[in-house]
UniProtKB/Swiss-Prot annotation:
The active site is at K494 (schiff-base intermediate with dxp). Keywords: Cytoplasm, FAD, Flavoprotein, Multifunctional enzyme, Oxidoreductase, Schiff base, Thiamine biosynthesis, Transferase. One of its GO terms (cellular component) is cytoplasm. Disulfide bonds: none annotated. The gene is thiO/thiG. It comes from Nostoc sp. (strain PCC 7120 / SAG 25.82 / UTEX 2576). Residues 393-652 are annotated as: ThiG. Its EC number is 1.4.3.19, 2.8.1.10. This is Bifunctional protein ThiO/ThiG. FAD binds at residues 5-19, 44-46, 173, 325-331. Catalyzes the FAD-dependent oxidative deamination of glycine. Is essential for thiamine biosynthesis since the oxidation of glycine catalyzed by ThiO generates the glycine imine intermediate (dehydroglycine) required for the biosynthesis of the thiazole ring of thiamine pyrophosphate. One of its GO terms (molecular function) is thiazole synthase activity. It is found in: Cytoplasm. PANTHER family: THIAZOLE SYNTHASE.
Amino acid sequence: MTRDIVIIGGGVIGLAIAVELKLRGAEVTVICRDFQAAAAHAAAGMLAPDAEQITDGAMKSLCWRSRSLYSEWTSKLEDLTGLNTGYWPCGILAPIYEGQESKGVRVQEGEGESPAYWLEKAAIHQYQPGLGEDVVGGWWYPEDAQVNNQALARVLWAAAESLGVELKDGITVEGLLQQQGQVVGVQTNTGIIRAEHYVLATGAWANELLPLPVTPRKGQMLRLRVPESVPELPLKRVLFGKNIYIVPRRERSIIVGATSEDVGFTPHNTPAGIQTLLQGAIRLYPQLQDYPIQEFWWGFRPATPDELPILGTSHCPNLTLATGHYRNGILLAPITAALIADLIVEQKSDPLLSHFHYSRSQKQASTIPMLTHSANFSNGHTKNPPLPTLDSPLIIAGKSFHSRLMTGTGKYRSIEEMQQSVVASGCEIVTVAVRRVQTKTPGHEGLAEALDWSKIWMLPNTAGCQTAEEAIRVARLGREMAKLLGQEDNNFVKLEVIPDPKYLLPDPIGTLQAAEQLVKEGFAVLPYINADPMLAKHLEDVGCATVMPLASPIGSGQGLKTTANIQIIIENAKIPVVVDAGIGAPSEASQAMELGADALLINSAIALAQNPAAMAQAMNLATVAGRLAYLAGRMPMKTYASASSPVTGTIS
């Protein structure tokens, strides 16, 4: 587990991540240039994925998930601090003007969908008295809500402080120190700050530190005060109009916002901006023209070209990105904190993160590499064109991999076949039996020279070990073997404890004992296990980097015989799940990935094929296809037929 973490940015996103990481046991430092300048102070606090009419499917899902967390999340923060966040599930009313949108009844189907109700003119004016005469109807979004954004920022700061997060306000970050693909420190105006892991959450200023497509979008806002002559708060819900929103607060203030101006970091309110806000607000709710103005302010939202956030891994394995939230930073704070903490602490990447990876803006990153080198196959198979991807890298023990297929080196008829197959598989991790290399077992001679270990990550395994003590000893040898091949920082080990010579089933007790010791010694342990959900959980709890449940006995080629248990493991694991052993055909590889497995390890099915290199490529394609299918989401199964072609509106 990564414990020492520096978060660059002290806005709502950075503080939310800091609190979540601290609650999970990490030591966290937050570096903040100016807490009062954070975009959170210039927001209105709407939690409005429905009213915003977000059309991107992944973004909508992210927003809905975050909104569903809000009640429990704010309660937790309030319990930690004794302060009020102003969370108010008041719903949002979206009035419309003539010609703005056609009327009708919105029908939303499917689990997780939010309801929306159309109100005719008479109904909406009765429901919310005082609306402008131009309002001809509107939508009611009962699940949207609001939070007092400024109160939330203060509560998050107080929560972080109370938990022991080190808060460094007034510190300017001048750059990220990088060496050999890692961030090794943060250069600030007061010196260098170092950690094991770093999180970039600097909002609109992200581009100052990394070449990310994040630009400032200025927003002007104002606050009105409900006069004392008005006995009750006239608005009990947010009004969301065309290019304007009106947000009532229970302490009798009303927020009006917001402009959206592409003017860089140009400061200050402008007469034109304030006039636009007042005109829009008064047209929507005319009595505001008589309310006193308390204050004006402005802020800078972090915008991206597609208006989606940038979340997840970066070009450095110890740098995580959480920026570009644009209009939805307040809304997305709880889900961002949870997903980023999962990624850093548990090395578990939620499939949703793949949609928000920084590489989506780079043309060259819009494909999955199928083959890393050219390969000549005897049957004429050639390198396939790359496929489009929604995916983010596989992360194991903080190290990123693009391929989700791992392979081995055993059972091949020749070194040449093994070399061709490794290349054809596109894999980045190859497991090697330490004992067989040490004893120069036939087929394992010359492995050090056979593969390019500068491009392939070695996964030493303890195959042949029958006890925990033996496996621990061989794991130590494996680490030294990796160092001899130039992988000085390789602490990976595939743990196998197999006393059963007939069925080659792993010993759960010995595996757990060995795993506990190896984790204490600093190994990233990848244990091979029966598909036992309870054992998988115990191994996760002791600190293993992955779990590797078998699909069926080693080398049997029986395919997926443990599907139900593997599904349970996948649903409950917070570390990567790698299905290992027994897969015999590409269709089975694809099926395992469709279940939600994070990766596969396949050796026998490739090595024992009539054309190993071609089978390696097929397994690569199947792994990619299964992963894409899992991310895309399977259509629901039905007990009845549903015509693919329309039965009405056809041309006769």
